[in-house]
Amino acid sequence: MKRQPKKLLSIFLVLFLFLFICSCSIWSEDSVTDSDATYLPLDDSEYPYADLPRLVIETDNFRQINNKETKVPAHFQFYGKSKPSGPIQDLTIRGRGNSSFVMTKYGYKINLAEKISMLGMSKDKEWDLVSNFRDKSMVQNYITYQLAGILGDEYHPQCKFLELFLNRQYQGIYLLVEHVKVSKNRINIAKNDSSFLFEKTTETSTNGVLFTSSLNYIFKFDQPKEPSIHSQELLENHINEFERFLQSKSIYNLDSIAQWIDIEDFIRYYWIQEFTKNIDGHRRSIFLTWEKKDSINTPIKMGPVWDFDLGYGNSSDKKAVPDQWLIRNYGWNRFLFKNKEYKKRVKDYWEKNRAVFVATLDSIDSISRELAEASSNEFKRWPVLENDSGFPFFKKFSNYQEAVDALKNWIEQRIQWIDENL
């Protein structure tokens, strides 16, 4: 009986050692399974770690995401190479995008249960997972958002690349992007009935409040989302008055233009769209802000920039070639460019900032190197590199680097044409 305490102690030590070894084994495996209560399962045997963060999302009861309206409850967790890099947290997920949700590789909108920093970006609840499906270089949106920031845009969306696993299925490389919204860390305007974030669109069946301007352009209210009748009339009347001004002789006076718009802001936005020759750059996903403060009309501002997968020649549209002007021939620009002083300011802006636009070539080299390894996973999951059969694919490539080189070549030709035709 005297030896029993020692025997019990030995049994306890053996049991403790066994449990310790078992707990360590969770971290030693490349794949985490259902048996791990605090980790979402990740089987990466077919699509191995490729030096990008990995976002694992699992919907409740593996419910499918099949539209842009229904918010599906889910959980998420970030992974590093062989283990989670954060806790399991709650979110809702739904489809997103004007056309990306009709493609095979869906785009998603996620809403977190609480504001957190995602991959080092500013804290918020609302984020977009952009598929970049028809952009085979996968970098067009990324380099353009970075360009806007370098040029001094008041706000440009922060973004980071990751690989997405949804309901235990690998989905490919996505761009995690700040959702465009009014907030302190994003579009920092007041939240009241006389401060507006709105967008030019071509959608007439979209959710939200729309109005059609005197020039027959469709605009959607983003903030306030549910504007009062007074707010609707305030913005609609202001835009219509501005469009009447554009068609008047006053358009030839630059000081008069400055009473309506932030000229520097409009020119910066113009050049980003014109440089990329974004086919959507005069039609939709065009965000604007305007505020009426203490009965004073502030200038209309353009931005943030958004959605460039149809830029850089990535379209079947005959206008997608690297020569000729595009954006100045449409929308409000076709009136503004009648003013010679305004046109000179546009020319001066390019000459002053040309080096910044040229530097996008270095940006492409840098980010494409980061994506090179993961691109093997992407094009294994979605074997579309050689597909040029029509929407959404118009060009074919033998490998990822060829797609990157084609983008760089288009930009070089675009810069040369602009230089020769200012």
Predicted regions: what is each one?
Residues 12-22:
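Bacterial N-terminal signal peptides
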Residues 151-163, 278:
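Short, well-structured beta-strand/strand-turn elements
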Residues 21-45:
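Bacterial Sec-dependent N-terminal signal peptides
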Residues 72-131:
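Conserved oxyanion/phosphate-binding beta-strand-loop segments in alpha/beta enzyme cores
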Residues 52, 63-65, 86-91, 99, ...:
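Middle-to-C-terminal accessory/interaction subdomains
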Residues 2-12:
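Bacterial N-terminal signal peptides that target proteins for export
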Residues 111, 115-117, 131-132, 153-157, ...:
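Internal "kinase-insert"/substrate-recognition segments embedded within catalytic cores
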Residues 133-154:
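A conserved alpha-helical element in kinase catalytic cores
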